[in-house]
């Protein structure tokens, strides 16, 4: 892949990551959300083959709007298939900086031992893996994907009381669903899905993540 194409891909991927962080409630500047390809090149370079940028240059650290101590890293490992050594380096950095959540944007995937280490570190450290291919477009901007809103515990309690339901009576959505993964929705959370409706203006459904 030539430099121009690779730079374009890296820009698109990082832009989706910025939108994802923003949509999860983390503080991202408007400049970060709106960064053009030219601005990306000015900041990071346009010659990936010469290490400008190296993937590690694209690392992101964001703090949550509601709680500045709730921070999240986004790592871009250099190696196409990520091994356990890299995961240990990331985990050490997270420990040093007292950060418990990170996203890892991988080119081709992870080795079985690296994948297992993510499972072993949860729930103390939450590391989520995304394939860069998944991030070339923002799935939530697709016209067929309805708006998803993660509900607070209070909103869920109110919803169940209003309809006299138990939580396990709600329809389900898988935690591995692409939109659920984008928002970082965990098992046991409830998501409100808002679809446009020709008759009612909008049609709302609720799903329990499993």
UniProtKB/Swiss-Prot annotation:
Cell location: Nucleus; Nucleus, Nucleolus
Presence of the UniProt keyword Nucleus in the record: yes
GO MF assignments: DNA binding; DNA-directed RNA polymerase activity
Gene Ontology cellular component terms for the protein in this record: nucleus; RNA polymerase I complex; RNA polymerase II, core complex; RNA polymerase III complex
In-chain residues carrying the UniProt-annotated modification N-acetylmethionine: 1
InterPro entries: Arch_Rpo5/euc_Rpb5 (IPR014381), RNA_pol_Rpb5_N (IPR005571), RNA_pol_Rpb5_N_sf (IPR036710), RNA_pol_subH/Rpb5_C (IPR000783), RNA_pol_subH/Rpb5_CS (IPR020608), RPB5-like_sf (IPR035913)
Cross-link Glycyl lysine isopeptide (Lys-Gly) (interchain with G-Cter in SUMO2) placement: 81
Keywords: Acetylation, DNA-directed RNA polymerase, Isopeptide bond, Nucleus, Transcription, Ubl conjugation
Pfam families, sorted: RNA_pol_Rpb5_C, RNA_pol_Rpb5_N
Superkingdom of the organism of origin: Eukaryota
Keyword DNA-binding part of the UniProt annotation: no
GO biological process, one term: transcription by RNA polymerase II
PROSITE patterns the UniProt entry points to: RNA_POL_H_23KD (PS01110)
Biological role stated in the UniProt entry: DNA-dependent RNA polymerase catalyzes the transcription of DNA into RNA using the four ribonucleoside triphosphates as substrates. Common component of RNA polymerases I, II and III which synthesize ribosomal RNA precursors, mRNA precursors and many functional non-coding RNAs, and small RNAs, such as 5S rRNA and tRNAs, respectively. Pol II is the central component of the basal RNA polymerase II transcription machinery. Pols are composed of mobile elements that move relative to each other.
Family: Belongs to the archaeal Rpo5/eukaryotic RPB5 RNA polymerase subunit family.
PANTHER family: DNA-DIRECTED RNA POLYMERASES I, II, AND III SUBUNIT RPABC1 (PTHR10535:SF0)
Subunit architecture: Component of the RNA polymerase I (Pol I), RNA polymerase II (Pol II) and RNA polymerase III (Pol III) complexes consisting of at least 13, 12 and 17 subunits, respectively. Pol I complex consists of a ten-subunit catalytic core composed of POLR1A/RPA1, POLR1B/RPA2, POLR1C/RPAC1, POLR1D/RPAC2, POLR1H/RPA12, POLR2E/RPABC1, POLR2F/RPABC2, POLR2H/RPABC3, POLR2K/RPABC4 and POLR2L/RPABC5; a mobile stalk subunit POLR1F/RPA43 protruding from the core and additional subunits homologous to general transcription factors POLR1E/RPA49 and POLR1G/RPA34.
Protein name: DNA-directed RNA polymerases I, II, and III subunit RPABC1
Taxonomic placement: Eukaryota, Metazoa, Chordata, Craniata, Vertebrata
